[in-house]
Amino acid sequence: MALKRGLSGVNRIRGSGGGSRSVLVLLIFFCVFAPLCFFVGRGVYIDSSNDYSIVSVKQNLDWRERLAMQSVRSLFSKEILDVIATSTADLGPLSLDSFKKNNLSASWRGTGVDPSFRHSENPATPDVKSNNLNEKRDSISKDSIHQKVETPTKIHRRQLREKRREMRANELVQHNDDTILKLENAAIERSKSVDSAVLGKYSIWRRENENDNSDSNIRLMRDQVIMARVYSGIAKLKNKNDLLQELQARLKDSQRVLGEATSDADLPRSAHEKLRAMGQVLAKAKMQLYDCKLVTGKLRAMLQTADEQVRSLKKQSTFLAQLAAKTIPNPIHCLSMRLTIDYYLLSPEKRKFPRSENLENPNLYHYALFSDNVLAASVVVNSTIMNAKDPSKHVFHLVTDKLNFGAMNMWFLLNPPGKATIHVENVDEFKWLNSSYCPVLRQLESAAMREYYFKADHPTSGSSNLKYRNPKYLSMLNHLRFYLPEVYPKLNKILFLDDDIIVQKDLTPLWEVNLNGKVNGAVETCGESFHRFDKYLNFSNPHIARNFNPNACGWAYGMNMFDLKEWKKRDITGIYHKWQNMNENRTLWKLGTLPPGLITFYGLTHPLNKAWHVLGLGYNPSIDKKDIENAAVVHYNGNMKPWLELAMSKYRPYWTKYIKFDHPYLRRCNLHE
């Protein structure tokens, strides 16, 4: 029994030992193999995701690399690129390509380890498991890229981006000269809107611009002079004789120091002492004499006096400018006198011009020039001939007064215009031009007109009427343009020229211009709000308001093509006489020839191209140089005639280049550029 009991105990122990062994096996399995499976699976997933990111980055770098290589190829020649490729291949493991081929991060590299040693480990026994794993990773990465990245939309967007980058790179590399010039011009236009004065003032490279104005001391001294005058008047009223004398002494010192200085640099060294001394005297005067009402009254009186002085000076300036425009310079007067004397010393047979048979030939090109200025007339003729293609076909009809008839003849006898024909006439020998036929001559004989012209104390002697008191408005040479068919009865067309113009191109094409039945061919001068009829005519008069449009465009005298056949048909001279008689009291327009010309040729003027006639060189300083150089005729209309000292220096060379200043007559009369 005991033996059985012992055997049964042993069996129980064995049974319990077998159960604990199975539990131990399960415990070891879960503790070892489960984590092992987890880490192995996670490692596979990480490797696949790394491969995916590496492939995508590699693709992104590939297209950037291709774009960069295209730009590089456009910049360097093939030989240079071959040298670069050879040098790059020779770098071996130091090359960027070898770095990119290694999938590991740079932080995993061992320093001091030979790369060739790592790559040479077990070259003949490749790891089968690693190869299988790499194949699986490649297949996984390719599938995931095709599913997640290589969609048609993304491919299309990437292609568009590549095209835009290529186009931009080509534009930057292949800019030609025209494109660069356009960009420069655009930059210049944008810079015009920038106030360069402000930029210069605040430039860190020009610190002197940050200082006070260059005339600050002068303005301070002028202010002190004004206040010294004010306090001098008050001191005189209050019998402060000592202070008055001191103020007057300092006032004289300040005025002496100021002189004609326009900037602080013009002031003497003692200016600062004078400023300080005057400031002390003014402070003393303010303590003793300051009275708000008295000071204000004195300043107002001084302001009113200054305004009156300004108006007087403006009127005087206008008068002097008009007077200067009327005068003939001494050298030109000398030239006229010398030529006149020499002309009347000639025998009658030597006073005739050649080729007189051309004067009435309608197949030639005829010019009408009415002038009493020998030098100006010579410039018109010379400039026309020098720019004519065939001078032998040009005929010049000059008309002057009896005072300049000899001088005009003598000049062109000594200086004939080449093969061209020229003829000089005296307006005083036109017997048909008398007061019974010509309204202007009849009006000039009236007492009212003589009073208007020759009495300076007349109520209308203001600056607004000074320009109409020019002697040219009294001369029949100025009104002879309205009698062209009577002066040249056998001509069909004639080109009228003023004596203050120069010709820069051949004018013969003007005879081929179709005037479309009009009488006058002229260049229009009107802008948006100026040089229209309301500027020249009195539209408060019912005769003017009824017959003309105030916004009608004005045109210019100076170069006009007249069709004399149409002139005779339409009785242009009769129309001129009618309106001139109506304007006897100057109620329709002021004196001059342009207003009656606008009226007479109203609706009968054919507009010419503006390039034929450029005006304003006698008053406008801002005419475009290109317009002047491209013009066929340049007109110095205005007071600043090119033969006067008033002339604008930048326009004068266009006129003087047609004068031979080495001519003996010009040298004797001291005529020079």
Curated annotation (Swiss-Prot):
Chain ranges on the Cytoplasmic side, renumbered to this chain: 1-22
Residue ranges of the TM segments: 23-43
Catalytic activity: [(1->4)-alpha-D-galacturonosyl](n) + UDP-alpha-D-galacturonate = [(1->4)-alpha-D-galacturonosyl](n+1) + UDP + H(+)
Coiled-coil residue spans: none
GO BP term (any one): homogalacturonan biosynthetic process
Annotated stretches, region: Disordered: 112-136
InterPro entries named among the record's database cross-references: GAUT, Glyco_trans_8, Nucleotide-diphossugar_trans
Glycosylation sites: N103, N382, N434, N538, N585
UniProt tissue specificity: Expressed in seedlings, inflorescences, flowers, siliques, pollen, roots, stems and leaves.
Keywords, in A-Z order: Cell wall biogenesis/degradation, Glycoprotein, Glycosyltransferase, Golgi apparatus, Membrane, Signal-anchor, Transferase, Transmembrane, Transmembrane helix
Family per record: Belongs to the glycosyltransferase 8 family.
Function, as annotated: Involved in pectin biosynthesis. Catalyzes the transfer of galacturonic acid from uridine 5'-diphosphogalacturonic acid onto the pectic polysaccharide homogalacturonan.
Name of the protein in its database record: Polygalacturonate 4-alpha-galacturonosyltransferase
Gene transcribed to yield this protein: GAUT1
